[in-house]
Amino acid sequence: MNWRSERIWIELITGSRKISNFCWACILFLGSLGFLLVGTSSYLGRNLISLFPSQQIIFFPQGIVMSFYGIAGLFISSYLWCTISWNVGSGYDRFDRKEGVVCIFRWGFPGINRRIFLRFLMRDIQSIRMEVKEGLYSRRVLYMEIRGQGAIPLTRTDENLTPREIEQKAAESAYFLRVPIEVF
C-alpha cells in the first residue's frame, strides 16, 4: 500500500508476515513434530501416532536421528514464528519533497536495534540504482545511492519483481526524487 501526493510519498513495506512464511512455519512445525513423535515412539516401544507403525523403527540409530531432526525442526520453526510475530523487516519509506528529507524505517529483532530509522537529505541522493542479475536465480533489486552512505536497498531481495515492475518502480522513484537512474 502506498500513499502519494505532490510533496510526500509514503511506501509501506511488508515484513515477514507473508503467506509463504506462514505456510513454511506450519509445514516445518508439523513435520518436525511428526519426526519427534516417531522418535519418541521408537524409544518408548509403543505407537504415539496411529498412522505409522513405529515399533518397526529401532531406537538406535533411526529413532535417535528422527528425534534429533524433530528437535532441530522445532527450533527452526520457533525462529520462523518469532520473526512472524515480531514482523521483522516491515516498515515504511517516506520521501518528503517539502522538507527535503527521506526517512526509512524498519522493524528489526528485539534488542537495542529493534527500530531501524535512517534519515537523510534529498540533496544527498545521487541516483536510483537498478541491479539486475539474470539466470537461474534471477535477482532485481532497487537501490538508492547516497553520498557518503553508499547504497540503501529500496526493494527486498526476495521480491520477485518482473523487469517491467522494477523499471516502473525505478522510474517513479527517480522522477519523484529528481535523480538519474543507473543500471548494473
From Swiss-Prot:
GO annotation terms (biological process): photosynthesis
Keyword field contains Ribonucleoprotein: no
Topology in the lipid bilayer: Multi-pass membrane protein
Keyword Transmembrane: yes
Pfam families: Ycf4
Alphabetical list of InterPro entries matching this protein: PSI_Ycf4_assembly
Membrane-crossing residue ranges in chain numbering: 19-39, 57-77
Positions in coiled-coil regions: none
Matching PANTHER family: PHOTOSYSTEM I ASSEMBLY PROTEIN YCF4 (PTHR33288:SF4), PTHR33288
Protein family: Belongs to the Ycf4 family.
Function: Seems to be required for the assembly of the photosystem I complex.
Protein name according to UniProt: Photosystem I assembly protein Ycf4
Provenance organism: Drimys granadensis
Lineage: Eukaryota, Viridiplantae, Streptophyta, Embryophyta, Tracheophyta
